[in-house]
Structures are given as structure tokens and as C-alpha cells.
Amino acid sequence: MQLPTISRTALKDVGSTAGGTVFDVKLTECPQALNGQQVGLFFESGGTVDYTSGNLFAYRADSQGVEQVPQTKADNVQANLDGSAIHLGRNKGAQAAQTFLVSQTAGSSTYGATLRYLACYIRSGAGSIVAGNLRSQVGFSVMYP
């Protein structure tokens, strides 16, 4: 998913967010046994995860979104999921990620869930922010009973 272009001034203070964009992860054709059960995403650890803030490091990219080589972290800006620290990469209980109810798909005999998240930019430091394209990523697994 792609966040919108924002002005550097939209991120005035450390912790301020901008460019919030909703994205969905849709689960389809779930087994009937999951009907009424809670499912969620477990965000994996990796090189893009800032374990201190719970956000994703943002890396400089070219105009096509291709990361610079070697990777260069953007100063004082990161990517945030869900408007609060999810503690990406930590164990399931410590992540505090939301869960979603599996239900029957309207007009169908199948079951599924739509997992809705919000991604945004977040100011992570007090120094200057350099304009440019940024990129980040995180792996995830689906958690279910």
C-alpha cells in the first residue's frame, strides 16, 4: 500500500502523525470452524522494525519506490501501523495487535474476515526531515485458534 505525499511541516512535533491511510487484509474461504472466532496478524521481526518505538524504519527510495543501496534510514520519520505502537516483532501477547471476528460472508456459504489497519508517517525525532521518497515493509502471519 502507498501512503500519500505530505509536507514535511505536517509532522511538527515528535510523535505527531500524518498521511493516515486505511488498508485491509482480507481473509476468505476460512473453515466454518472459525466462524465466531477472533483472528489477527502477528507482525514479524526483521531489519525494518524499530524495537524501541514499535514502528517501522523508513528507508530512502528513488521516485519509483526502489530503496537506495546501501539502505539509508530516513532521519526523524518512521512508518506507524494502527496509530499506536504495536511492538512489531515481539511475542504475540506483547504486540497488543487488534483481532477481528470471522463471520459468514454476506450472501454466501463461505466465511472470512476483513482486518482493517491504518498506516501513517510518524515523527520519530526532533531533528530536520529531508523531503523524498520513503519505503518500508513488514512480514506478518495470520493468527487463529
Curated annotation (Swiss-Prot):
One of its GO terms (biological process) is cell adhesion. InterPro entries: Adhesion_dom_fimbrial_sf (IPR036937), Adhesion_dom_sf (IPR008966), FimA-like (IPR039458). It holds the Pfam family FimA. It is found in: Fimbrium. GO terms for cellular component: pilus. Keywords: Fimbrium. Its main location: other. Belongs to the fimbrial protein family. This is Protein FimA. It comes from Bordetella pertussis. The gene is fimA.
